[in-house]
Amino acid sequence: DFCEDLEILYVEGHSQDGTLDEIYRVIESYPDKDIKVLVQDGKGKGDAVRKGFDNARGDILMILDADLTVPPEDLPKFYEVIASGKGEYINGTRLVYPMENDAMRFLNFLANRTFSVIFTWLLNQRITDTLCGTKVLTKKNYNKIVANRSYFGEFDPFGDFDLIFGAAK
């Protein structure tokens, strides 16, 4: 545990592969942990991110995608940067370190690189992986992003772009 008051929220998006049963099995295996399940009302990652963040009670919010392309063991590093005040928004990256073969399809890699170049230019801030699922920010800053979300509305299906643009404002 890297923080005293850790809350884990699983946002389940109506999967048909037994994910919800597995989540409940994990919860039963760790009765001393604060683990909750939220069943997604809408569709897509963006909706899941908003559902999780809106229901989180903590001051520091983290996203870890189920594909685990960023190892959970790296989360304490992200947490420390935010908790120490050295950063306000942390966007993970999968594209600066060697990846396993087939970890990302070529077209996804190419699109992500293209988004990274565009976002770096638009925001005047180096962004190496716009679609990395690992992101960390404070609840206070997330609430500011929500209050100013009108530039994207609910359009962002990934839940990545509105966070990146919102954090840059």
Q: Which residues are covered by each model-predicted region?
A:
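A conserved acidic beta->alpha catalytic loop
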Residues: E12-D21, L68
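Acidic donor-binding loop at a coil-to-helix junction in glycosyltransferase catalytic cores
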Residues: E154-L163
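Conserved donor nucleotide-binding strand/loop of the catalytic core
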Residues: L6-Y10, L20-N55
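Short, acidic, metal-binding catalytic loop of nucleotide-sugar glycosyltransferases
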Residues: D1-D5
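Hydrophobic residues within well-ordered alpha-helices
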Residues: I82, L163, A167-A168
